[in-house]
Amino acid sequence: MGCLGDSKTEDQRNEEKAQREANKKIEKQLQKDKQVYRATHRLLLLGAGESGKSTIVKQMRILHVNGFNGEGGEEDPQAARSNSDGEKATKVQDIKNNLKEAIETIVAAMSNLVPPVELANPENQFRVDYILSVMNVPNFDFPPEFYEHAKALWEDEGVRACYERSNEYQLIDCAQYFLDKIDVIKQADYVPSDQDLLRCRVLTSGIFETKFQVDKVNFHMFDVGGQRDERRKWIQCFNDVTAIIFVVASSSYNMVIREDNQTNRLQEALNLFKSIWNNRWLRTISVILFLNKQDLLAEKVLAGKSKIEDYFPEFARYTTPEDATPEPGEDPRVTRAKYFIRDEFLRISTASGDGRHYCYPHFTCAVDTENIRRVFNDCRDIIQRMHLRQYELL
């Protein structure tokens, strides 16, 4: 009878043994993958359009990868430099397109504004005609006359006056930066600097992941762009992220969104923040609030042409909090403005705060590498605590 229990052939026994060993290897790899997954800090980057999310990602690459070198992580410095130069070369076209879009948008707006803006030098009209004639030319090759006309128009006081009213139409933030660099960009051997690449605006849509390591800690940053209408469908997919970094264009208080040309951009950001803060899938995930574009906010406030109270009447009654810590040499008007915007967001987070998640505000300038380095270092302890709490280790 005992023989009946051992009726398997040698081949069958060997096959079962091999299967058990394969299962052990798979289980071991799964455990390893699980440990790596749990040890990785996953950051979800959110914010309204043109708030600076993609620029934050670029800064992470400059600071913690190998700059603008494709996938990053090359051990060979020469290969890293080669890849970096290659990517920079491919970005030249994007930068030239930004330059072209900037001058086209400004001169097209001159006749559409109310009241319209006239050229300071009427003899420049033929230059305006040229710029408008090439507006929709596909695969534009940027001949020398383009740069000549663009530079002459940018030096026209009427064009500058129209630029000063750019909150009345849709103009990319980097317009002045690249228009001021026409003589550099037009050179045949032009290679963009890191600052040029940080300023370059390319519309993002979809979800992009950037991986980097800081002091042997792995970070995965997910940049979500162009998803205004689809947000409610995919947001639940990120309910296990370590933290949300919410980016706000603080300078957008006097601008409207591209989608409808009516909704105030800062109000749109407040509405989006509220929807994320109260989202049932994210109720345990804390938010690091990047109050971005502080440089542009300061310029607007000090220029005095667009007053915050004209768009947010409650600002007229706002006083700077006693615990405010201005930057060295910062004008009190700028301090009051930036803390008002901060408190508008904190009002949302404290109104529905249940102790399960918190909001940590920071003032940022995404094109300033040292500012982002300092802010991200300040955030790392917060992120680490969130990570420990996420896996009930704290």
Curated annotation (Swiss-Prot):
UniProt entry tagged with the keyword Repressor: no
Record GO terms (molecular function): adenylate cyclase activator activity; beta-2 adrenergic receptor binding; corticotropin-releasing hormone receptor 1 binding; D1 dopamine receptor binding; G-protein beta/gamma-subunit complex binding; GTP binding; GTPase activity; insulin-like growth factor receptor binding
Keyword field: Cell membrane, GTP-binding, Lipoprotein, Magnesium, Membrane, Metal-binding, Nucleotide-binding, Palmitate, Transducer
G-alpha domain sequence ranges: 39-394
Region (Disordered): 1-25, 68-90
Residue numbers with lipid attached (S-palmitoyl cysteine): 3
GO cellular component: a single term: heterotrimeric G-protein complex
Residues bound to GTP: 47-55, 197-204, 223-227, 292-295, 366
Residue pairs linked by disulfide bridges in the UniProt entry: none
PROSITE patterns to which the protein is assigned, alphabetical: G_ALPHA (PS51882)
GO biological process, one term: adenylate cyclase-activating adrenergic receptor signaling pathway
Residues that coordinate or bind Mg(2+): 54, 204
Location of the region described as G5 motif in the Swiss-Prot/TrEMBL record: 364-369
Chief place where the protein resides: membrane
Location of region: G4 motif: 288-295
Residues with lipid group (N-palmitoyl glycine): 2
Residue span of region G1 motif: 42-55
Recorded family membership: Belongs to the G-alpha family. G(s) subfamily.
Name assigned to this protein: Guanine nucleotide-binding protein G(s) subunit alpha
